[in-house]
Amino acid sequence: MAKKVQALIKLQVAAGAANPSPPVGPALGQHGVNIMEFCKAFNAKTDSLEKGAPVPVVITVYSDRSFTFETKTPPASFLLKKAAGIKSGSGRPNTDKVGTVTTAQLEEIVKTKEPDLTAGSLEAAVRTIAGSARSMGLVVED
């Protein structure tokens, strides 16, 4: 018989830097999950990613206090900021442009995010990421 799901927890944790302090500790502690076990497993799984990159994770907690987790790819905004070499996006993206990204950079980002994107084709995915770039105040160049 399948285990009964007790909770579904969504967090964003820095790659390789999960520790019992907030936000991880309180979120898992209230469901009785072994926090250190999660931290060790998460850090081992995100070892190959860039240190400090925010990684969305979905943790499924079962009624016997066991858990499974699935990591996603870093947010598009993080990847776009890294590609453009900026610290943050524009507060007024329509008037203040803060950087530029090329179509080649967008395609690299799409390849990174491919498992999490629902776009039907590469071109559609590039258009999606280009829209995110424009909403951050980045100029998209061919």
From Swiss-Prot:
Claim: Cell membrane is one of the keywords in the record: no
Entries under SMART domains matching the protein: RL11
Listed name of the protein: Large ribosomal subunit protein uL11
Top-rank lineage group of the source organism: Bacteria
Pfam families in the record: Ribosomal_L11, Ribosomal_L11_N
Stated family: Belongs to the universal ribosomal protein uL11 family.
PANTHER family: 60S RIBOSOMAL PROTEIN L12, LARGE RIBOSOMAL SUBUNIT PROTEIN UL11M
HAMAP family membership: Ribosomal_uL11 (MF_00736)
Assembly and oligomerization: Part of the ribosomal stalk of the 50S ribosomal subunit. Interacts with L10 and the large rRNA to form the base of the stalk. L10 forms an elongated spine to which L12 dimers bind in a sequential fashion forming a multimeric L10(L12)X complex.
Free-text description of this protein's post-translational modifications in UniProt: One or more lysine residues are methylated.
Gene3D superfamilies referenced in this protein's UniProt entry, alphabetically: Ribosomal protein L11, C-terminal domain, Ribosomal protein L11/L12, N-terminal domain
Function: Forms part of the ribosomal stalk which helps the ribosome interact with GTP-bound translation factors.
GO molecular function (one): large ribosomal subunit rRNA binding
Keyword set, alphabetical order: Methylation, Ribonucleoprotein, Ribosomal protein, RNA-binding, rRNA-binding
CC annotations in GO: cytosolic large ribosomal subunit
An example Gene Ontology biological process: translation
